[in-house]
Amino acid sequence: MELIKIATAGSVDDGKSTLIGRLLYETGALKSDQIQHIEEKSAARGFGYLDLSLATDGLLTEREQGITIDVSHIFFSTPKRRFIIADSPGHVEYTRNMVTGSSTAQASIILLDARKGVIEQTKRHFFVTQLLGIKHIIFAINKMDLVNYKQEVFEDIKTTLNNLVDKHGNKDVSYHYIPLSALYNENIVNRSEKLDWHKGEALLDLMKAIPVESNKANDGVFQIQYVIRPKTEAFHD
């Protein structure tokens, strides 16, 4: 069975953890006790829906603050492919963690909030993927439910992204653009009737179609995020 690692990127509150939680839920990767825990926590917070972001926030601080700080690696599978998803933080101060999570990825999903469009953190994460040489980029315009699933909103964002790619993108990279709503499972596992103007595939189908390249050239590589050294004359910095 094929194995592919995909990193997530995007600004804070763009919905990365919710998207991954949705993928886990819809592919049957969550156990019954995990679902029960999410149901209880969602109800306790007064939500009328499942807060699937809880499926990925592992640290106590993350659970308390409702944010992602460290990189979480999540596993799920379909009949023909296994996935490792790196859930990376969106806050600017945790960009280093995002770089670490993306450093071994074969593809990246860059999420955007449909209400905000392309912002500074979107561009920053895009540049990181180009620097790391990631060959497959999916721009996922999330929260389309909050803009009434309007095609013109998606097209405006896509045009801005295309301009960014044309100016700064690597030529040997494949770029994809997809509108979705992770919260309501629109265009995640199956094509959405509310987004029927979009003729492309659902997100999971797109993820399953990404070519898996051999990583033999990287065998033996050990990624290091930060080196702590003694403060001496030999190592003064």
Language-model segments: residues:
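P-loop NTPase switch module centered on the Walker A-proximal segment
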Residues: 2-93, 105
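Signal for well-folded cores of large energy- and translation-related assemblies
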Residues: 24-28, 39, 43, 60, ...
